[in-house]
């Protein structure tokens, strides 16, 4: 079987569901996994997810807003964590020196050739080198508040050269725009963990084993 690139939605510590998904797609030695970010917080196994991505070169991820929050906190910035981030911070902070180098290394964007991977979004009409880290980790809509769920979705307007694979904004099914596909289908909220296989254009998903977060 030819090697495949499997892009998965927000994990949020849902390690068991990731294993279920990899079993479903018959993940092989020559395949790779790219996550759209938010490896950590909210779910039960952030440590296991981080350990996997740090130890196996087949796994990579872009920076999500929750990953960024822990990175900033553990690097000594005086930021206030969200309630949903505090349990993971408390559980892992004694080992933060082990995880900080990896979190520091996460890129905000990965170019897969035919596709781009980013956590939240890209602002239409803005060159890649001019996209802000805030937009790449927080963007939902094109109104005054980038994080708003009520404004015009960025992916309805985006029409770049490459298809963007993103997460951050959970929905029951993958969000599909002109040149963008959203893969956060709310696993941590009891819904599904979804993936897109670059080479075949297939969507795959598995159900959450339980509801981990109600926020």
Model feature map: region roles:
Residues 12-17, 41-43, 67-71, 110, ...:
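Active-site environment of divalent metal-dependent phosphoester hydrolases
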Residues 4, 8, 13-81:
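Core catalytic region of metal-dependent phosphoesterases/phosphodiesterases
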Residues 46-117, 124, 130-150:
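Active-site neighborhood of divalent metal-dependent phosphoester bond hydrolases
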Residues 38, 113-115, 201:
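Well-ordered beta-strand scaffold positions
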Residues 7, 61-62, 111, 115-120, ...:
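Short hydrophobic-aromatic micro-motifs
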């Amino acid at each position: 079987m030819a090697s495949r690139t499997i892009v998965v939605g927000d994990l949020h510590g849902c390690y068991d569901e990731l294993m279920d998904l990899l079993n479903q797609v018959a993940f092989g030695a020559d395949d790779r996994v790219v996550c759209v970010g938010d490896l950590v917080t909210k779910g039960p196994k952030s440590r296991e997810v981080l350990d996997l991505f740090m130890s196996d070169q087949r796994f990579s991820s872009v920076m999500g807003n929750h990953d960024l929050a822990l990175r900033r906190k553990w690097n000594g910035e005086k930021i206030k964590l969200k309630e949903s981030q505090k349990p993971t911070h408390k559980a892992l902070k004694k080992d933060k020196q082990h995880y900080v180098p990896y979190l520091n290394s996460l890129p905000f964007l990965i170019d897969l050739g035919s596709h781009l991977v980013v956590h939240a979004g890209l602002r239409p009409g803005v060159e890649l080198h001019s996209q802000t880290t805030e937009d790449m980790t927080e963007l939902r809509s094109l109104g005054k508040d980038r994080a708003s769920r009520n404004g015009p979705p960025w992916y309805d307007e985006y029409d770049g050269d490459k298809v963007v694979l993103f997460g951050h904004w959970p929905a029951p099914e993958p969000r599909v725009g002109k040149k963008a596909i959203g893969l956060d289908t709310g696993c941590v909220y009891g819904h599904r963990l979804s993936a897109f296989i670059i080479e075949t254009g297939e969507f795959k998903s598995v159900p959450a084993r339980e509801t981990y977060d109600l926020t």
